[in-house]
């Protein structure tokens, strides 16, 4: 009986060092109480387990049998646990949490490392180990910390080092609860600095391979940066791997080497191995995955022959042992709560990646708009912490920065630049401009903004997307045709000015009742609207959006009309300047010829010096005019190319504007020999103080389409047929 009690007491002491569930801990407490009652009745000498741990290193082990004749060793009075340090901890301070037991305060193992071991920036190849390094001492935290919620229901907890992006290490309290890894910056924090669901993660153990390296656990999740944690020993790494496997597989059944994925998204083992083998190694201790074991491409290939003998004998070589990796496939990744609620189901998503200019450097940030604030996150998965938050009320949106970054827009407050953002495409830029205009409460029309560094096609896409986004953000409905119905279905601008879209039709049949109809990719006109009342549209004029005429939706009709008109006006001005410059050059050349003749006549006379001075000035003026003529020719060529592109888009859209007779193409029947003044577009009022502006000529186009006898193509064909009859008659 006495031997059984002694062995049972030793067994309970061994259980204090193991990770136990709450049920086992309760049973252990009951057995301990029974054992204490038996020992007190039998007269056994019972000692507290915590006092044994404190005096284990300095005092001999207590006898296993009761020896009453041996005097009891003197024990110092219990002065209570040491207080927490008030000053900041040294750089090499390291703690490891010991598993909790019932009725005890959490214990932590501390050790001190030198500064060289804490940094991975520089590695040493010295293989000598210091004997005094890594000695462990135990201390207990105060009793009021024993009930802290951080580690109450934790499966395992410890202070581990986390590897930062540039190789630095930072200490975190890592706790595993349920199926999540929680990282706290301090044990006094109530909210975790990082929360990582273990489902869908791959955990890799990277052994220590040199003096300056550490035992590392690498946790990789698809779409995120890997999390690298440093542990003290291989045994601790195996404990963490075991607990992580139990934490996830305990919900569905027994612990396996690989947890099966959910049946809704099956992932075969061969596909998983193929996917893992295609990943590029990001650490010195990683390699290519083959049959669940990670092998290294570097040293292992060189020493493979040397290690073959030891492997044949049933042992593992040093290099191979360092590269053994335990990979746990824990199913498909579940989106976090913040990702599920990040406006993914809204009509217009108010989040996305943008390039942000910070300290003269462009950085990609995940941006989202929430509660009239523009919030910048480092990554899409890290939504609980943000870099900066900008209130949008009172801000002004200004597109453009320079020619190198054409898709850039800025946020200004009281004339001061708050943020500089760059989108990845014209649609993305228009979406963000519409969102920011709606959130800032601005009454600015997206087309009233100046897009200085993008062309007509891109600006049309930006403006149209911005208008659509603005209407969605304000819960307004854009009708398929603004000339149908009342003004309540049109685009209602905050300033009260009615803005009309192009008459390019969109599909009404494919739109469901859940979402409001969206206008096509046409561009709205700026300035004055037509004074005529809206009329009922001709159903024959409705164009279905198919592959044959999909190019019509690539441009904004009215914007191209206005741009073509502006380019034609500019071309006329340049041609006039060119003609005037040519006449001036001819006059200067004639004067220069006369001066040279006069100098030859007055050779050796007094007026020769005056004539030579005049000739020098005349030649200088000729050079200036010649340089001006070259610049004018280049500008004229550029304007002609732009006009050609605009007219090509006009042919696609069926515009009313026509090219000049000098630039008309004889192959196209649309290019008729008539001037711009005879076109229907001239009847619209396009006067503005800023110059030519886009106009909305829908009513005029409908009038021209309603008259079948006035078709220019038909008149052209009849005239040609009459000419052929006259030729045949002669």
From Swiss-Prot:
Consequence the record notes for mutating residue 77 to A: No effect on tyrosine phosphorylation
Subcellular location: Cytoplasm, Cytoskeleton, Stress fiber
Motif (SH3-binding): 71-74
Residues carrying N-acetylmethionine: 1
Post-translational note: Phosphorylated on tyrosine residues by SRC.
Ranges of biased composition (kind: Pro residues): 60-85
Phosphoserine, modified sites: 282-283, 548, 664-665, 668, 679, 687
Sequence motif SH2-binding 1, location on chain: 94-97
Basic and acidic residues compositional bias, start-end: 268-283
Residue ranges of the region described as Interaction with F-actin: 594-637
Keyword Membrane among UniProt keywords: no
Main location: cytoplasm
Region feature Disordered, mapped onto this chain: 47-91, 119-140, 252-292, 512-537
Signal peptide (UniProt feature, chain positions): none
Classification via InterPro entries: AFAP, PH-like_dom_sf, PH_domain
Domain PH: 153-249, 347-441
Tissues in which the protein is found: Low expression in normal breast epithelial cell line MCF-10A and in tumorigenic breast cancer cell lines MCF-7, T-47D and ZR-75-1. Highly expressed in the invasive breast cancer cell lines MDA-MB-231 and MDA-MB-435. Overexpressed in prostate carcinoma.
Function as written in the Swiss-Prot or TrEMBL entry: Can cross-link actin filaments into both network and bundle structures. May modulate changes in actin filament integrity and induce lamellipodia formation. May function as an adapter molecule that links other proteins, such as SRC and PKC to the actin cytoskeleton. Seems to play a role in the development and progression of prostate adenocarcinoma by regulating cell-matrix adhesions and migration in the cancer cells.
Subunit structure: Monomer and homomultimer. Interacts via its C-terminus with F-actin; probably involving AFAP1 multimers. Interacts with activated SRC SH3-SH2 domains. Interacts via its PH 1 domain with PRKCA, PRKCB and PRKCI.
Note: Knockdown in MDA-MB-231 cells resulted in loss of actin stress fibers, decreased adhesion and spreading on fibronectin.
Record-given protein name: Actin filament-associated protein 1
The organism of origin for this protein: Homo sapiens (Human)
